[in-house]
């Protein structure tokens, strides 16, 4: 059975034109092979680890979709954002960290790639996850300006002491996943 999956290759060309059901600013919905598929941008997600201070950087974020369901204004999430046209994951990562966390990472900083993962079965988007162990020489701090949106203006980066990792209460599965990865990373390094 595994041989079947190891030989899978991405579609090289469209056999037929995809039917667009909806097209919006951030995503579209297409019909393909009897499925409704959400077509959107890939995104970077990360947790910076500030080594000297034993802290991680998270986001206390205003997320309208979560508020719609829970009524709660703010949620604990990750530094994250879409990979824009012309960007590779590392470029998008450094831009998002500056916009959302106010950290300017030195250009020659080497990031370790983790395996990109699909967001859901119904979406073409992939998350490119990163854990960034940073020494003070790897970055300098600036004021996080966000992307100009209302949600960004109502959100902020927060530094969390590593000793409180087990008491954090994330609202989404990808934040939970990344916190588990950070704990795994820290246990390997201790």
Annotated model-derived regions:
Residues 2-3, 7-8, 72-75, 85, ...:
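Nudix hydrolase/Nudix homology domain
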Residues 11-52:
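Acidic, metal-coordinating catalytic segment for phosphate/diphosphate chemistry
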Residues 26-33, 52, 118-142:
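Active-site-adjacent beta-strand/loop module that shapes the phosphate/pyrophosphate-binding cleft
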Residues 28, 42, 74, 79, ...:
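Residues that flank catalytic or metal-binding motifs in active/ligand-binding sites
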Residues 36-40, 115, 162:
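Short amphipathic beta-strand/extended segments with alternating polar/hydrophobic composition
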């Amino acid at each position: 059975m595994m041989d079947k999956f190891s030989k899978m290759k991405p579609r090289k060309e469209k056999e037929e034109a995809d039917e667009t059901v909806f097209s919006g600013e951030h995503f579209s919905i297409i019909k393909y092979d009897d499925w409704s598929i959400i077509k959107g941008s890939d995104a970077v997600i990360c947790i910076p680890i500030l080594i000297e201070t034993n802290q991680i950087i998270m986001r206390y974020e205003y997320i309208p979709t979560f508020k719609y369901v829970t009524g709660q204004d703010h949620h604990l999430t990750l530094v994250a954002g879409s990979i824009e046209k012309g960007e590779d994951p590392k470029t998008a990562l450094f831009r998002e960290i500056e916009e959302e966390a106010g950290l300017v990472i030195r250009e020659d900083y080497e990031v370790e790639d983790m395996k990109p993962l699909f967001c859901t079965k119904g979406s073409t988007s992939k998350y490119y996850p990163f854990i960034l162990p940073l020494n003070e020489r790897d970055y300098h701090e600036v004021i996080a300006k966000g992307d100009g949106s209302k949600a960004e203006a109502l959100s902020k980066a927060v530094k969390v002491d590593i000793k409180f990792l087990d008491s954090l209460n994330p609202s989404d599965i990808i934040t939970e996943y990344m916190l588990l990865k950070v704990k795994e990373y820290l246990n390997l390094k201790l």
